C-alpha cells in the first residue's frame, strides 16, 4: 500500500475541500478578511468529462481510475470553446459541515488562494510552516518562506538576478543602489520612473482583501473584517538567554510562528504593486496585533500588462508528495481557441509551453490565417513549412549510420537474458557469449570506426570480442538506471571498442597549471565570509540596507541575467531553456589531443557573449591551437592553460567562428591560418581588462583564479563566488584531476561525491548547480559540469559533482576556478523576442519543480520506496525502458560480481528519491476551472525535460501502445524542431497525441 496513494486521498486533494469536502473544513485563515478558501473560480468542483480526463492530466492518472486520469478537460487539439469540457465547468458550491479534523491538516495542501473581488490580485492564506511561490505573469516573481518569514521579489523588468526583500523598507524592483532610510522606517516615493518600495504599517483594509469573486462571493465576504478589530501591538520576538548572539530586530510587525497562520494579499492598483502581510492565531483574540506590514512598489508602464497569476504550493504526507499549480487568468485577451491549446499544454505538466503550443498548431491542418500563429516567435512561424517537411521527408541516414543503429539494437537484445516474467533484465555472462554476438560485436566496432571522428580507433588498438563485451558490460552496469535511448547513445562512444580502454583519456586532458603566487597585500580571508561584519550590523541598524555586499560587482549590470526561472541563487540550469543562447552551444569533442584548456576557455568566453546578448556562436578552437607563437610540432601533446588563451587573442586581436575554421584534432599543430575576408571576428571591440586584485585570488591580466584549498575553512564562500560568476557570466573554468577518476563509463546523471587532488590535469566548465538528497537522506548541492569529451560521454557531455565532497577529503574535487575579466559591449540589437504565448503562460523550468520539492524535503519524514516497489510502479506506468534489472537489484552477494542484474556502481552517493510526486494543475478563468494531474515516479522524473508517459491515447486502451511508440522512436525525433509532430507522423493509425511529451 505504500506504493500507491489512496483513491480517497487523491479525491480529497483534487476537490480541494472547498466544493466536496472529504473530512470537513478548518476555519483557519478567515482573520482579516475573507475565508481561507478557494474562491473566484478556484473550487475544484465536479469535473466530470471524458474518461481520460484532462488533456493536461498525466497519462498515468490516479490510481484506481483509467490509465490516463480522471479530471476532465478537453481532448488534445480540441479548440472549440463551445465544448463544455474544453472550456471548463461552472463552479457550484456545496454546503458541507465546517468541522475540522487533525488529519485534514496533514494530508492536503494547506496553502489556499483566491482572487480578490474588486482588485486585480490574489489573497493567499495558510499555516506558518507552509511555503509557496507566486508569479505575476510575465514580470514578477514572489518567493514566500513562511517558516523564516522571508518574502523575496524578483522581476524581469530589469536585467538583474538580485532579489529584493519584503522586510527591507527600501530597495527597488529595477534600481540597484544603497538606500538610506528615514529613522521611522518609511521611505518616501522617489519618483515614478523607477520601481520604489514604500514601507508602511497599517490596519488591514477590508476592501482590498476581499477574496470573493463574481462566482462565489458569499463564501468569504462574511468574514472579511474579523482581524481589523484587534488593537494591541505585537512585540518583536526576543532572544533567549542562551542565544550566543543578539539577533537584530526584525523590520516586520508580523513574524510567523508555529501554530499561527498567515495571510498575504497581492494586488495591482494603477502602476503600483501592493503587498500586505499579516500573521494571526487560530482563534480570534481581541488582544492580537491588528497591524499589517505593507509594501508598495512603483512599476513602470509596460507594453505587456500582467495577464495571469500563477501560484505553486507543495505538501508532503506519508511519503506522498503533492505539487499544486494554479493559474488564474486575470487579464487575458488571448483568443479562446489559442488559450485552450495553451492551457492544455499547461495542464499536461509540460514545461515548454511554446514547443507544445507550436506542436498543437503543426498537427492541425495548415491554416495560414490562424490567429494563434501570432503567439509564436516569428522565426518559428516563418519555418512552419520547413518544419513540416522535416518530418515528412523519408530520407534515410547514410548506409553506415543505418547499419550502426541496427547493430546497436541487435547487441542490446543479445546481451540480456529473458527472465521468467519475459523481461530482459539480466546480463549474460562472458561464457554465454555465442558466435552470433561475437560477430555482431566486431561488425559494430568496424562500423563505429567508420563514423568516429575523435581519433580513438585510429590511435589505439581495437580489442577482440571479449574486450568489447567486457567494456560494454561495464558501461551498462555503471548506467543501469538509464533508459534505452540513452544507452543507445552511449554505445556510440568509440572507447568501448578499445583493447586497453583506460588508455582513452591519456590524451584527452591537457591542462598545465601556471606558476602564480598570491598577492598577500590583497589577501583577506574574511571578505567573502558570510558572517556580517560589525560595520554591516551598524549600518543596518541605522537604516542603510546593502542589497548584497558580496554579489554586487561593478560589472553585474552589464550582463543579461534576468532568467530567474532557470538560474538563481538556489539552482541554475540554463540548459533546460531551449531558447536560451547557452543551451544552443553544443557539447564538443577535443579528440585525441590535449586541448581541454582551449575548449574550457573558449566556452567560457562563448557564455560571456551569450550573457551580453549575442547569438550563440562557437569560437574556433583550431585557430587558438595553431596561432601559438611557440613550437607547433607537439602541440597536441603539450597542454597549456587559459592564460595562454587570453594571450593569443590579445596578440592577434581576432577570434574566428568555428564555422570559419572547423576543429579537427589531426590539424592541430599546423600554421596559424591567414584570416579570410568573410570570417567573422567574435572578438570585435573586445578588451582584456587588467587584474582586479580580488581577495583570496590569483590575479593576472584578464582573469581571476580562486583555489579551493584557500577556502578550506570557508567553502561556503568559495561556492558563493562560483554561483555569482555563473549567474553573471554563464560559466566558469574549473581545474580538476581526471586521471584515475574519470573514464569512458563515468556516469553523468548521478551526482558524484569525489575527493580532489593537490594538482590538476584537466580543464572543464561549471555551468550550473542544483540540489539533491544523498543516500543518507541529507540535503546536498551539486555543480553541473561541462566536459569536452563529446555528447556520448557522461550525461550528453555533462556530469554532476557534489559541491563539498566527502568530509574526509583533504582537497575539493574542484581544484581551482578561473574567471575571465573582459570587456565586451552589450548587444541589444539581435536579442530575439520570445514567443508572445509567454505573456500569458509562465516560461517554466523542470529545475523549478524539483527545487520546490527539495526546499520542502523533510529528512525526518522521508519515506523512500524499495526497488521492488519502484519496479512495480514502472510497470504500472507502462514505460518498458525505465530501468534494466530492477527486479533483482541488490541480490548479488557482497564482494562478488553479479551477472544477474545491472547494479548501480561508481562513487555516487545520490539516491533517486523514490517518493511519489503528484502534480495537480488548475487553470481558472471566468469563474470556471479546468484540471489536470501528472504523476512522477520519483524526484528525478520531475526534473526531466521530456517524458513519453505524457503521451495521450484517444482510446485509453491504447495508452501503453502510445507510450511504447514514443519510447521506441524518441531517438529518431528528439533532434527535430517539433518532436511531437515527428512522432505523430510515425503514428500511422492516428491513435496517439504526442505534443505533451
Swiss-Prot record:
Active-site residues, Swiss-Prot/TrEMBL: 762, 787
Chain positions with Phosphothreonine modification: 549
Known EC number: 3.4.22.-
Gene Ontology CC annotation, any one: extracellular space
Site entry (Cleavage), positions: 200-201, 390-391, 842-843, 886-887
Biased composition (Gly residues): 30-51
Keyword Membrane: yes
Region (Disordered): 26-107, 181-252
Keyword list, A-Z: Cell membrane, Disulfide bond, Glycoprotein, Hydrolase, Malaria, Membrane, Phosphoprotein, Protease, Secreted, Serine protease, Signal, Zymogen
GO MF annotations in UniProt: cysteine-type peptidase activity; kinase binding; peptidase activity; serine-type peptidase activity
Effects seen without this gene: Conditional knockout at the merozoite stage, does not cause any defect in schizont morphology, merozoite number and maturation initially. During the subsequent invasive cycle in host erythrocytes, merozoite replication is severely impaired due to a premature rupture of the parasitophorous vacuole and erythrocyte membranes resulting in an inefficient dispersal of released merozoites.
Record's compositionally biased regions (Polar residues): 68-84
Compositional bias annotation for Low complexity: 52-67, 85-103, 183-196, 205-235
Annotated signal peptide: 1-22
Annotated region (Interaction with host VTN), positions in chain: 373-390
Highest taxon of source: Eukaryota
Site (Ancestral active site): 596
Gene Ontology process terms (BP): exit from host cell; proteolysis; regulation of immune response
Modification(s) after translation: Just prior to merozoite egress from host erythrocytes, proteolytically cleaved into multiple fragments. Cleaved by SUB1 into p47 and p73, p73 is further cleaved by SUB1 into p56 and p18 and p56 is further processed into p50 by an unidentified protease. p47 remains covalently associated with p18 via disulfide bond. p47 can be processed into p25n and p25c by SUB1. p25c and p25n remain associated with p18. Proteolytic processing is essential for merozoite egress from host erythrocytes.
Function: Plays an essential role during the asexual blood stage development by controlling the kinetics of merozoite egress from host erythrocytes. Specifically, prevents premature rupture of the parasitophorous vacuole and host erythrocyte membranes.
Assembly, per entry: May interact (via C-terminus) with PTKL (via SAM domain).
Family (UniProt): Belongs to the peptidase C1 family.
Name of protein: Serine-repeat antigen protein 5
Gene (UniProt): SERA5
